[in-house]
């Protein structure tokens, strides 16, 4: 997958051209029937989306997502509240527009010539390619030539249908596929992982995020080139909503908030290491439970899962870890740092975690107040790794090379230059392994994404198991002995109560008559 970047110049030019074309006919004031006036009179911006890590998700009661944050900012821009409706698939999203149940679709939708015949696109803010995925260990198709409908299923309304149809007509006459009207892309990806489905097609960003939690998901091939992503609204003669969107995107491009949101959700890099991710998730299951209470106890200024990710990057959660340079423990503290924090044993798990958390808080406190709140942690982590003085040099170098020293996107690009003599020889604090600091922060972000997604999925599975237990009371050994299946009777004698197979071992509770 190519590096995702917002084309800011394109947005700016498009904004100016379209705004100039639309402005004379825009009834911003005086008419109550235009889109903007209707939204403001209602006091609510209605946005339909799909539940996914990138677009919109709810974790521990808090809402996240690139499209969600942009939609919330747009609602604030209009001076109204935001109402989000989550749909299962893309077809249902466009139904909301057709039926007048949504003002906007904000769900990582691809700009497509077929779509723009019927719907109004907004500014294009990042790009993706469509990719065919399979499960690691299964047959990997190298071409679409032999893929058929018994193997490939896609979600309804998926933009790739047009591409598949064109490929079938021009290159692969035997290509066929099935559309499952009842399932969304996320469900189909899960079915590929579980082995229920051979292949599906999804966008490259969604796949990249999915792999952080499910490393067994693999990309077989690219079906399309990079395609721009945009929002959609109704297509009619009223251009007020389109003009407001262009003005909004231009403003957040100019003030830097668009770049910050991109960095937050797309800035973790697109390289994927199957072995490393598998090893990390095994450690989450086998090692983290013992350390989790300590991370929760000492993570005061940051999310405990981020502190856990930092520790894994430092030591792979090994309390006895020691580097050739002498740093030791779960948080790999130097002897001098440990002494300054009052620690007596760097290999003691609690001392190391508490000390590392305090040291990180010290680094965050030093980050200039001009750095946006949601990016301060990345500056602090780079300083944690290579020293705060070298972080000051990185900011200074960013200014000298026409970048923004308060933007993590700009500063991280200069970090590798700290080890190059033409640059470090002119800096106050000299040589630093800036490339290592860059990789350090990127790895931590990837581990955090994996940890948050993995734990969220486990919580979901536990909740489903609890519901199953409520609906299906456990069958006792006595009941199993009466069952017409001899192997169930045998199992009942060895395991007391069985709770593995609801279809065989449980009886649904009778619902109380109302």
UniProtKB/Swiss-Prot annotation:
Annotated stretches, region: Non-LT domain: 31-269
Catalysed conversion reaction: Exolytic cleavage of the (1->4)-beta-glycosidic linkage between N-acetylmuramic acid (MurNAc) and N-acetylglucosamine (GlcNAc) residues in peptidoglycan, from either the reducing or the non-reducing ends of the peptidoglycan chains, with concomitant formation of a 1,6-anhydrobond in the MurNAc residue
Organism domain of life: Bacteria
E.C. code: 4.2.2.n1
Biological process annotations from GO: cell wall macromolecule catabolic process; cell wall organization; peptidoglycan catabolic process
Protein localization: Cell outer membrane
Any single Pfam family the record assigns to this protein: SBP_bac_3
TM region positions: none
Signal sequence, renumbered to the chain: 1-30
Top-level EC class as recorded in UniProt: lyase
Annotated GO CC locations: cell outer membrane
SMART domains assigned: PBPb
The entry's keywords: Cell outer membrane, Cell wall biogenesis/degradation, Lyase, Membrane, Signal
InterPro entries per UniProt: Lysozyme-like_dom_sf (IPR023346), MltF (IPR023703), Solute-binding_3/MltF_N (IPR001638), Transglyc_AS (IPR000189), Transglycosylase_SLT_dom_1 (IPR008258)
Region called LT domain, residue ranges: 270-514
Annotated membrane topology: Peripheral membrane protein
Active site residues according to the UniProt entry: 314
Gene Ontology molecular function: any one: peptidoglycan lytic transglycosylase activity
Domain remarks: The N-terminal domain does not have lytic activity and probably modulates enzymatic activity. The C-terminal domain is the catalytic active domain.
HAMAP family hit by this protein: MltF (MF_02016)
Family: In the N-terminal section; belongs to the bacterial solute-binding protein 3 family.
Function per UniProt: Murein-degrading enzyme that degrades murein glycan strands and insoluble, high-molecular weight murein sacculi, with the concomitant formation of a 1,6-anhydromuramoyl product. Lytic transglycosylases (LTs) play an integral role in the metabolism of the peptidoglycan (PG) sacculus. Their lytic action creates space within the PG sacculus to allow for its expansion as well as for the insertion of various structures such as secretion systems and flagella.
Identification of the protein by name: Membrane-bound lytic murein transglycosylase F
Protein source organism: Salmonella typhimurium (strain LT2 / SGSC1412 / ATCC 700720)
Name of the gene: mltF
